[in-house]
């Protein structure tokens, strides 16, 4: 779940 959240945040940024 951690890596997935990181990817989502990177997508927004």
UniProtKB/Swiss-Prot annotation:
Protein localization: Secreted
GO biological process, one term: innate immune response
Positions carrying Leucine amide: 13
Keywords: Amidation, Amphibian defense peptide, Antibiotic, Antimicrobial, Immunity, Innate immunity, Secreted
Tissue: Expressed by the skin glands.
Keyword Glycoprotein among record annotations: no
GO cellular component: extracellular region
Family: Belongs to the frog skin active peptide (FSAP) family. Temporin subfamily.
Protein's job: Antimicrobial peptide.
Name of the protein: Temporin-1Tp
């Amino acid at each position: 779940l951690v890596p997935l959240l990181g990817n989502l945040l990177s997508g927004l940024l």
